[in-house]
């Protein structure tokens, strides 16, 4: 199973000048993974739904929120390989394998469109184990309702990165991600949506360190597996703070936030025309 796989271009198209991955981050390829049976998509933003990756997985089964299927059909994924879900829709895929799309506090949009497709989170129940995948979401009491319906969870995979007070309703702070895991009654929380793309002004390791510390404070177990590391459902998971042994890489604009405060409006005005043009061209390409 894959959740929101993005193995395509280095930049989040159609923003051809960024955001991009951290310099040393791209060290793996889709071809290095085993055969993928199922792909779960949470919403259609470019950093969660990548056209080239989807087309490379054209023999997999896709589970998507309402409206996201239209993108996949345009990209030549057969309709019989796509299942669409509304919030709290459930499906039994095979004996002992049940899934459900659950709400998230976010939005959708691709190209020049906005909110033309649904967004959500996923619950996966495999025999006696339950996994929650948040996708993108701000913090809300919906986590309590999800636990009431499907909990407790062995693992809650929750976004904890790319946060900022300007968009705190659609992305969680690390401390909120821990609270979400507590609300979900999760044995272990795995933080995601961090250390990949530069989408906010916090430091590279800030999400992981804050989640780790908040987990210790609240007695919520946190595991931060490295890429390629494996674990077995139902068995103890390590909480190794590996990022402390990695040299920090903070782009210059994360170190000069005062300058950024002056430059951002100018960059916005200079780039808005380019963004609109590139989004239009990208949408034409996808269509």
Place the predicted regions along the sequence by residue.
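Active-site metal-binding loops of divalent metal-dependent hydrolases
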Residues: 5-7, 44, 104-105, 135-137, ...
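Cap/insert and terminal regions of metallo-dependent hydrolase folds
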Residues: 38, 61-63, 67-73, 140-226
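Metallo-beta-lactamase
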Residues: 32, 65-129, 210-230, 234-237
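Divalent metal-coordination and catalytic microenvironments
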Residues: 4, 43, 50, 62, ...
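Pre-active-site segment of Zn-dependent metallo-hydrolases
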Residues: 2-40, 44, 51-52, 67, ...
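Mobile, glycine- and charge-enriched loop segments
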Residues: 114-121, 125-132, 137-171, 220, ...
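Short active-site oxyanion
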Residues: 57-61, 130-131
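C-terminal regulatory/interaction regions
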Residues: 201-287
């Amino acid at each position: 199973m894959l959740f929101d796989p993005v193995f395509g271009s280095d930049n989040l198209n159609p923003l051809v000048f960024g955001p991009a991955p951290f310099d040393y981050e791209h060290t793996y390829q889709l071809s290095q993974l085993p055969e993928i049976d199922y792909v779960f998509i949470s919403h259609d933003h470019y950093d969660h739904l990548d056209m080239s990756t989807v087309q490379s997985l054209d023999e997999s089964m896709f589970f998507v929120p309402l409206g996201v299927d239209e993108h996949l059909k345009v990209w030549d994924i057969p309709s019989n390989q796509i299942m669409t879900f509304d919030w709290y829709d459930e499906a039994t895929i095979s004996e002992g394998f049940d899934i459900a799309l659950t709400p998230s506090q976010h939005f959708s949009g691709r190209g020049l469109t906005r909110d033309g497709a649904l967004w959500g989170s996923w619950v996966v129940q495999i025999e006696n184990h339950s996994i929650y995948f948040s996708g993108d979401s701000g913090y809300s009491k919906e986590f309590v309702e999800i636990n009431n319906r499907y909990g407790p969870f062995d693992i809650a995979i929750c976004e904890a990165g790319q946060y900022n007070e300007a968009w705190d309703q659609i992305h969680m702070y690390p401390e909120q991600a821990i609270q979400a895991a507590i609300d979900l009654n999760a044995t272990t929380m795995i933080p995601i949506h961090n250390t990949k793309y530069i989408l906010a002004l916090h430091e590279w390791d800030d999400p992981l360190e804050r989640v780790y510390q908040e987990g210790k404070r609240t007695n919520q177990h946190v595991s931060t597996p490295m890429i390629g590391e494996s674990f077995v459902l139902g068995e103890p998971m390590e909480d190794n703070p590996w990022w402390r042994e990695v040299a920090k890489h903070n782009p210059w604009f994360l170190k000069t936030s005062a300058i950024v405060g002056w430059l951002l409006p100018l960059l916005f005005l200079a780039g808005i025309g380019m963004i609109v043009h590139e989004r239009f061209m990208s949408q034409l390409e996808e269509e």
